[in-house]
């Protein structure tokens, strides 16, 4: 059986992944989540900047749910045109 294919798109923003890939737990590990999904580093930092682990566990464990928050919707609109390895400080 061949190894699984490398991920190609970010779980959050759906842009192609670049060289650096981080793995996000949609349900945080501290809340017994085991599944991981590939994300850009900037997307990963933004998730954890905007949401607590409790919020991620209870209400925001899908990209669609995350995008319902206005701050995340603005981020997703802004990041959509950036290249895969785009990096900027997360404030």
Can you annotate each of these PLM segments?
Residues 87-91:
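Long, charge-rich low-complexity segments
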Residues 33-38, 46-86:
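Polybasic, low-complexity binding patches
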Residues 6-38:
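Histidine-centered nuclease catalytic patch
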